Amino acid sequence: GDTVKFGMPMAASMTLLAWGANEYREGYERSGQLDEAMDAIKWGTDYLLKAHVTKGGKTEAFYGQVGLGDVDHAYFGRVEDMQVERPAFKIDAQNPGTDLAAEASAALASAAILFRRSNPGYANKLLTNAKQLYTFADRYRDRYSNSITDAAKFYKSWDGYEDELAWAETWLYKATGQKKYLTKAEANYDGVGWTQSWGDKNFGTSILLAQARPNRKKYQRDAEQWLNNWADGAGGVQYTPGGFAWMSEWGSARMAATASFLAGVYSDTVQDPQGKYAEFAESQIDYLLGDNPNQFSYMVGFGDKYAKQPHHRNATGTPDFNTPANNRHILFGALVGGPTAPNDNAYRDVRSDYVANEVALDYNAGFTGALARMYDKFGGEALSDAQLTMLPGISVPESSL
């Protein structure tokens, strides 16, 4: 339940959020959520722009963390009442962070595509900063957690930085159309990794390259190897009797949701002749929303039976996270960690079990795109402003009612 500003998962979340809005813009529009999505993304990209220090048109530094993980974790209360040390940490030429700078570049480039239509001036600003960050990332190379050592305890760069370089290059190609970025992306692309996450971008890149290079089957093979693992229950993925694709104790719902988003994108934009990847994508989102043996929704505030104790300090409303009472505030829309083992009953709605109940930016990033796809494909009825206002803790300005 911390409030440390960890730059790596934050930037990775913005990239995925923007990708979802780019791919399924109509789904966001039809559900009445495009403005909200763009506001959320701009909140994140505005922060990344502020964290980016330039001089003479070049990156001088990028602030990749604010706060100390252990100190922040020791406090569980309202953020407005925090009285703890919150130092800022940066990467620069002497203390590089290739993966962090490249991920920030990818986020800004992905968002630039999204804002191009409605706010071209802002899109240009995003793209200029994305190019500067990429040049810096490519020139000064090292894992960011070697420079920002406090981050190594929580978001360590385990698999190097080549995947982030290829990821950024592919997004820059999509944002600019300049072949030089595509050429570099193909050179840096390293093939199959673990799974798409804040720290591993191989599979997202394989799908982007499969879109860009339809005649080069390697990217399709790599993407489908990963997607088949998820759809078939192989390569570390295990299925519960109720149909949940489980991969890891930490954030199992997040991993399945992100895989679902990418499976949907691949099915819709590359190929899926048997409908296998679309079926996987939809089945996992259905499971997370309550179509499971326990009829339990892992999305807070959705359905009749949902997670009531997400591990989130402000939502809890008390400094004692061991209190048995449900959270004082409903954290609408948050996706909790999910089952901690490949078992439909391996989840406890207990705040102190932070492995199962933690919430995070990257937990919702791919999930949101997957939901937009579902709305785009199957439709639905969005809540009216009047209905939203009736929800506890939700307020809609009168001018919009």
Label for each model-derived stretch:
Residues 1-23, 65-103, 107, 111, ...:
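Aromatic (Trp/Tyr) and acidic
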